[in-house]
């Protein structure tokens, strides 16, 4: 990854808050293999009055447009800590991207200190509202001052 992306490295302390903020984009990198996948995690009902607090839709980047080339994989249930691949997904449950996100939520998400070879980077935009991050605190956490509750 480019040197400047080190600024977007999520710490273990900020990881869960950022990913479950409601509209997060992040890249999971395995430094040993060099494999990486970019995911979007969006809270169910986001942008409506029907927001469900514990259901998150997971999509993977499949094309060259980093904003819109995402394909739905499945759902993460934050209250149970459980990821489920959806039968409605156009991507097979045996696809590497699905295996990575399943492993991410089942193993890494709750024990990131045990996997030093894995790095998680945010996209440089707030994981909740999507605005560009500009303050040092926001860049570190992945959440803007308002969304991160610092103002």
Residues covered by each model-derived region:
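Non-membrane alpha-helical secondary structure
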Residues: 7, 92-97
């Amino acid at each position: 990854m480019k040197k400047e992306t080190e600024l977007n490295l999520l710490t273990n302390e900020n990881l869960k808050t950022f990913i479950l903020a409601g509209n997060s984009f992040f890249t999971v990198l395995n430094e040993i293999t060099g494999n990486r996948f970019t995911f979007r995690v969006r809270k169910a009902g986001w942008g409506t009055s029907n927001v469900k607090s514990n259901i998150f839709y997971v999509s993977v980047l499949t094309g060259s447009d980093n904003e819109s080339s995402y394909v739905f994989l499945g759902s993460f249930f934050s209250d149970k800590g459980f990821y489920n691949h959806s039968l409605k997904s156009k991507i097979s449950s045996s696809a590497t991207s699905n295996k990575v996100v399943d492993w991410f939520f089942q193993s890494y998400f709750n024990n990131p200190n045990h996997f030093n070879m894995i790095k998680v980077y945010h996209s440089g935009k707030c994981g909740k509202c999507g605005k560009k991050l500009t303050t040092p605190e926001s860049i570190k956490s992945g959440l803007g001052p308002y969304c991160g509750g610092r103002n």
